[in-house]
């Protein structure tokens, strides 16, 4: 349970590195901590840790979607929340997949894993997220 709460917290830190907050060290801290958690867990557990990380990341990072649906789309409060949560949950599947693939493909060479494999997996999944099913490039 503690691991999942830390993963959620790490996800909440990530968007704080971007506008309007611009506290860029939080992004580095977020990624460092989530990599630590992924290493600590099993391959199956890595997906869940990544998914929960995504819930925090997307929950804070795209909170404007709720505003658009509720206020500009004139949808009810509960319906807007449910739709936004489903959207965030689906986007979090990509961060779960990133964590799973990293854990699955990880070697014993830490330099190769952290400097090459993780960034390549992260960017590849980001490209997939940007185009698959019409994409969401945010």
Please state what every model-predicted region is.
Residues 1-138:
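Membrane-embedded alpha-helical bundles of multi-pass enzymes
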């Amino acid at each position: 349970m503690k691991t999942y709460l830390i993963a959620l917290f790490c996800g909440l830190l990530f968007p704080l590195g971007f506008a309007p907050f611009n506290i860029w060290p939080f992004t580095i801290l977020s990624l460092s901590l989530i990599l630590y958690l992924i290493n600590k867990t099993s391959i199956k557990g890595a997906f869940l840790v990544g998914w929960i990380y995504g819930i925090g990341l997307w929950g804070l990072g795209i909170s404007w979607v709720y505003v658009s649906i509720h206020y500009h789309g004139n949808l009810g409060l509960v319906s807007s929340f449910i739709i936004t949560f489903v959207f965030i949950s689906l986007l979090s599947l990509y961060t779960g997949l990133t964590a799973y693939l990293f854990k699955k493909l990880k070697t014993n060479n830490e330099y190769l894993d952290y400097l090459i494999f993780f960034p390549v997996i992260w960017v590849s999944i980001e490209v997939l997220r940007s185009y698959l099913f019409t994409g969401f490039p945010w």
